[in-house]
Regions:
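Internal alpha-solenoid helical repeat scaffolds
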Residues: 139-314
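Extended alpha-helical scaffolding segments used for macromolecular assembly and cargo binding
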Residues: 72-153, 162-166, 441
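Amphipathic alpha-helical segments of tetratricopeptide repeats
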Residues: 39, 96, 116-117, 132-137, ...
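Residue register of alpha-helical TPR repeats
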Residues: 9, 77, 110, 145, ...
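"A position-specific structural signal for the A-helix of alpha-solenoid helical repeats
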Residues: 81, 94, 114, 149, ...
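C-terminal boundary/linker of central alpha/beta nucleotide-binding cores
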Residues: 1-68, 77
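Structural signature of alpha-solenoid helical repeat junctions
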Residues: 74, 94, 100, 107, ...
Length: 450
């Protein structure tokens, strides 16, 4: 009987280790039971020397038995214990899964807030979308952090009306709070973050917004959450926002905005100004070799005091300048070394864009087999489910399709991006999109290419 109960209580979980088995079952002899099961039965399989799972047919039977025997309250308690185990390990994705299955909305809210602080930037919202969407509206309206998250999430889903609605709710929340109220200060901080970060806002007002937020910071009226300036892309000028309009006055903006920008962005601002002006000059066709030589020594400071986003932006610019000066092998090595380093550090959200960048280098050097391998194994290829965070990969995918002589596939890949490019003033992405579309039309002998 104790073994049977032990099995039923672990059935909801795909895999587990000894510590989790002990915590979920509450059985101090969990180690002995696992040892007995491994020795005398074939119910358990090893994931590795620490983790186990039931074979799928047996787990399905156990779950059926558990549904039959355990009350809903008891099942929810098991999920809550599993959620607590993952929470203590700071594995918030699995913890959220458990708490959602157990219907514990307050824990889901709490973890979403905590996870947003641990993993800043727009990528977090896309990963956590289903948990945000599962929360009751009243729960979201009670939390400035969750309203901020919903506003950004709607923007990333290209629901700009929904995004502005949640921005308005957050604004109303801030107005209801007093100037000294901690919740009011948090709401004003989140509004300032959205004013800078929302993709549909463009960059036109940022030259006024950033100094205004800088003054609020200096007066300790707001404390800003972390940003993701690049959205895990190898660029600042075409990262979270398109800053190409600033390129005309880059020297003036560098002198006037450098200090406010670095103060407002905190860790995200380390190395940003120097990388941004070097990239601006590069995009205008100027020689940036000298600027790169002064920028590279800052990489250590970026690693120690900054963010991996900026590290990728600097390395991405270096690789592009190496490619432009006829050193494709060096460009490939720059990205490969960084990819290995990021993989070791568990920074997996950058890897898909790094792989896409390596694919572009392969096409530049004529290694079409490698480009086709990326297309088969890693390209998004999901025209009906647009994720704007993958736009760099969509454009790379279209390049491979052109290379393979498939102009219809190019149009299918690029068409969903057009509304995003227009609504969010993405000038550089728009140039890439229009050039690739024009080439595809030309190859089809369609006069619209003009």
């Amino acid at each position: 009987l104790p073994v049977r109960r032990f099995l039923l209580e672990l059935a909801p979980f795909e895999s587990f280790d000894l510590e989790m088995a002990r915590m979920v079952s509450g059985d101090p002899r969990a180690g002995e039971r696992l040892d007995w099961l491994l020795r005398y039965t074939t119910m358990l399989r090893y994931d590795d020397c620490q983790r186990f799972h039931f074979w799928s047919g047996f787990r399905a039977f156990l779950r059926w038995e558990m549904e039959r025997e355990y009350t809903e309250e008891k099942r929810k308690a098991l999920f809550s214990r599993g959620g607590l185990y993952y929470e203590l390990k700071e594995d918030y994705a699995h913890a959220l899964e458990c708490y959602t299955s157990g219907g514990d909305h307050s824990k889901v809210s709490e973890l979403l807030v905590r996870n947003a602080e641990l993993h800043p930037g727009m990528g977090h919202y896309a990963e956590m979308e289903k948990y945000y969407r599962s929360l009751p509206e009243a729960e979201i309206l009670a939390s400035p952090s969750l309203m901020q998250g919903m506003s950004m999430l709607c923007a990333l889903a290209m629901d700009y009306e929904g995004s502005e609605r949640w921005y308005g709710e957050l604004q109303a929340f801030a107005e209801r709070c007093g100037r000294q109220d901690a919740a009011g200060k948090q709401a004003r901080s989140r509004l300032a973050w959205l004013d800078i970060s929302l993709p549909q806002r463009g960059v036109n007002g940022l030259t006024e917004t950033i100094p205004a937020v800088f003054r609020l910071l200096m007066n300790k009226e707001v404390t800003l959450p972390s940003f993701s300036v690049t959205s895990a892309l190898p660029s600042i000028m075409n990262g979270g926002k398109d800053f190409s309009a600033w390129s005309k006055k880059d020297d003036l903006l560098y002198k006037t905005l450098r200090l406010p920008v670095e103060a407002v962005l905190g860790r995200d601002g380390v190395g940003l100004a120097d990388c941004a002006i070097a990239e601006s000059k590069f995009e205008k066709g100027e020689d940036v070799a000298g600027r790169m030589l002064s920028l590279l020594p800052q990489l250590n400071e970026v690693r120690n005091r900054g963010t991996p986003d900026m590290e990728f932006a600097v390395s991405g610019l270096l690789a592009r300048s190496q490619l432009a000066s006829g050193q494709p092998a060096d460009a490939r090595r720059t990205i490969e070394v960084l990819r290995e380093c990021f993989a070791e550090r568990g920074l997996t959200r950058f890897l898909p864009n790094m792989d896409a960048m390596l694919c572009r280098i392969d096409m530049h050097t004529g290694d079409l087999d490698a480009a086709d391998a990326w297309y088969r194994e890693k390209a998004p290829r999901e025209p009906t489910h647009l994720n704007v965070m993958r736009r760099y990969q969509y454009l790379t995918q279209a390049m491979v399709e052109l290379e393979d002589g498939r102009p219809d596939a190019v149009q299918l890949t690029l068409a969903p991006l057009e509304p995003y490019v227009q609504n969010c003033a993405r000038i550089i992405d728009g140039i890439h999109l229009n050039v690739l579309t024009a080439i595809a039309l030309y190859r089809k002998k369609d006069e619209r290419w003009r």
